[in-house]
Amino acid sequence: MKIKTDEITSVLKQEILNYKKDLGVEEVGTVLEIGDGIARVFGLKNVMSGEMVEFQNGIFGQAFNLEDNSVGVVVYGNYLDIQEGFSVKRTNRILEVPVGPELLGRVVNPLGEPIDGKGPINAKLTRPVESPAPGIAMRQPVGEPMQTGIKAIDAMIPIGRGQRELIIGDRGTGKTSIALDTILNQKGTGVICVYVAIGQKASTVASTVEMLRNKGALEYTIVVSATAADPAPLQYIAPYSGCSMAEYFMYNEKKATLVVYDDLSKQAVAYRQMSLLLRRPPGREAYPGDVFYLHSRLLERAAKLDDKYGAGSLTALPIIETQEGEVSAYIPTNVISITDGQIYLQSNLFASGNRPAVDVGISVSRVGSAAQIKAMKQVAGKMKLELAQFRDLEAFAQLGTELDPATQAQLDRGNRIVQMLKQPVSSPYPVEEQVVEIFAVTRGFMDKIPVAKVQEYGKYLLNTIKEQYSEVLDSIRKEKKISDEEKLGEVLSKVAEEFLRKH
């Protein structure tokens, strides 16, 4: 066999001519010490604050402290897999998470990696975790309701699309239940929901996901979970990741979105832990000086965008856990001052069976009736006043003095309102049904119903109206107002008489 040398020579020459030597320059540092999720790195002279760095075993971190001789890096992963002497290289990019419709129905960690065992998420886009809040010119006033399906809230502490409403209370008062009921109530409305679980037990998150799946709410929801077992940096970054995932739908798809941060107290604790380990000076309650900015830059990203930017919205429901009802502690006062109102939950109301345990007296919505449909405005204003008067009279009546008939009637009606506002968990009411019930109790159409049977009557009333007078509900749903109060009054009188005959 004859070897064609000239052919081989020409191929070799061609290869040599085509050879290019690509020189890649990487800035590399060395881990000096590692522990508690924080690495001190020598080198990386030109690293930027907030830049992502990569350790030699593939774990990522973020440059937090830029000091004279070293860089303080927080580790987004298991720091036990990193050793002294490991090399660390710059990535020249900031922390980004995958975003897009591919994440709907999935459970992810704060880096956007799936943790539900359903395979990879092939998201086509990413967004920076930290992004600026929309400016004044990009916003419009909040005026469209975000229905929670909870009578006490939709009637007296209404939430609008683009609002930030704080849910605050001691542990075990039903804060998460209110947020999850609001997510369930968005079914069929086209609202995209993001539930961010921070520092919770993995078992609690699993049962929440299961509940959302069973109720058919997971298909329009993204769950971002940083459990109590995850490192502090992941718990710190979780709310910002969830917010970025929702922002994609607000900016790119022009949709209404709802984000629940459950809860920001644990995020502040994680941030305090990181700051102290980075040797940043502690302030009040050992929190760092910028803990207000931690929450303000997150919650300012909630907005109702102006029409020329697509009119999308991001509604935020941050949750704060208080200790023994102490709302004047550092983190609660910070978040109260940032948000557009708060829903207070009291443990004594919860214990006495008033659930949801909303204290209407000190809960406020700074958006107010702008976030209600006309039908709800027609019936709810009167109820808030009656309930406030009832609370005053109730304290007076406990003195055991003889009450005149008018005062007694007011007390009885107040008791009926309290009973009517009770609502089991995971059963949100459509707004037209709420309007009918509130109209009935405030206009005296329940005055003959015994207080103990008000809840039973509420169910009977709605079932009867759905079966026999469905046009009443249809008209409220379509016109968003009660167009014929007399007709509604006649229907309610009839139903009340029927109920009293049967019982």
Curated annotation (Swiss-Prot):
GO terms for biological process: proton motive force-driven ATP synthesis. One of its GO terms (molecular function) is proton-transporting ATP synthase activity, rotational mechanism. It is found in: Cell inner membrane. Its EC number is 7.1.2.2. It is a peripheral membrane protein. Its main location: membrane. Belongs to the ATPase alpha/beta chains family. F-type ATPases have 2 components, CF(1) - the catalytic core - and CF(0) - the membrane proton channel. CF(1) has five subunits: alpha(3), beta(3), gamma(1), delta(1), epsilon(1). CF(0) has three main subunits: a(1), b(2) and c(9-12). The alpha and beta chains form an alternating ring which encloses part of the gamma chain. CF(1) is attached to CF(0) by a central stalk formed by the gamma and epsilon chains, while a peripheral stalk is formed by the delta and b chains. This is ATP synthase subunit alpha. It comes from Leptospira interrogans serogroup Icterohaemorrhagiae serovar Lai (strain 56601).
